[in-house]
Amino acid sequence: MLINPKEILETIQMVRMEHLDIRTVTMGISLRDCSHPDIEIFNENIYAKITSRAKDLVRTTNEIQSLYGIPIINRRISVTPIAIAAESCRSRDFVSIAKTMDEAAKEAGVDFIGGFSALVHKGETGGDLKLINSIPEALASTEKVCSSVNVATTKAGINMDAVGLMGKVIKKTAELTSDRDGIGCAKLVVFANAPDDNPFMAGAFHGIGEPECVINVGVSGPGVVNAAVCELENPDLTEISETIKRTAFKITRMGEMVGREVSRRLGVEFGILDLSLAPTPAIGDSVAAILEAMGLERCGAHGTTAALALLNDAVKKGGAMASSSVGGLSGAFIPVSEDAGMIEAVKAGALSLEKLEAMTCVCSVGLDMIAVPGDTPATTLSAIIADEMAIGVINKKTTAVRVIPAPGKEVGDSVEFGGLLGSAPVMPVSNFSSETFIKRGGRIPAPIQSLTN
């Protein structure tokens, strides 16, 4: 794929006019050597390690931002899942660990820290349960901490006991942050097939197979892709796909260049580049707008899933051509509150929860930043999670749910989080109960396609 001088000028235009940026440079840090039965000593260990490893992250990314003229929006840290690192701690809960992570993130100057996490796709240990039960208070009492729980994999099936528990945890988290529209739930995600090297929040954690310290980069360019599609004159879908592919190539090249330079300057291994198109609430930086530029009157109309499949596939093909270090989630995000076009589609009645669920079959990562009525039962939240986990498990892909049961809100109201988290209209859920199904518990077995050996 040859790049001509005109395309170099186009790249400059992308940064200046079309919201092209590096969404996140995320430093992954292993905390496995910090374990200690005394939780106070454990907290001292993780604070010292996080702050020492990440002390130059913000300064270095600022220097590179100035050098290349490419905006870097967030600097983040991910750590070993705390349920694993703190397993030996003799403590009733892990809230103090979350507070220590928050203090370390503030000292390092980063925007978020992820890894208050547990992996329970086949069952829970004592440490897992301590962490999960600590999530509501942990997220209510911190600013920068993000939490994730993996409850399903294609190889293990779906842990329905954990799914049932997470519905209650989400409700409790919303209640404890009710003064802020339930913002704690915006920092909590439930996964199937969670990746070990995801740079995006709220699901980032430093996986067990990862090195001591690593730099992972997430790019963002919906506005760039939308502009490229809009410039075409009456194209067919093949031409649209080719245009998106070429645009994704340029976006990916830029992201890898920045990531490798950050790694070189910090003396840290470069991990992966996540290709995900991550929208923002800014006008013109929307995944929904790309789908509408393909010919849909509104995102959510019939044909939306097909258009999203085309977009996701073309982004992956262009990105894979540009880098041999593609990882993380690498697809197109469809978070309602973070995408101006999605918000308008919901308000217009074009986009429902059920249609969003269908769209998650062909993209990453799942039902993201969805606001539902505050009186939604915990079992209904668990059932929404179970449906999304089934899509991930059967299709051998990452799926997730980040849902906000907005305290005191009804359908038609909206929640306001500000910043990259944006705002979301409250969407209706089914009035029919899933309680008996969720309370059965147990495990939905792994599908036949898990038998690959």
From Swiss-Prot:
Pfam name, any one: DUF711
UniProt-listed InterPro entries: UPF0210
Gene3D superfamilies recorded: 3.20.70.20
UniProt superkingdom: Archaea
Signal peptide start and end residues: none
HAMAP family named among the record's database cross-references: UPF0210
PANTHER family: UPF0210 PROTEIN MJ1665, UPF0210 PROTEIN SPR0218
Family label: Belongs to the UPF0210 family.
Protein name in the entry: UPF0210 protein MM_0081
Species name: Methanosarcina mazei (strain ATCC BAA-159 / DSM 3647 / Goe1 / Go1 / JCM 11833 / OCM 88) (Methanosarcina frisia)
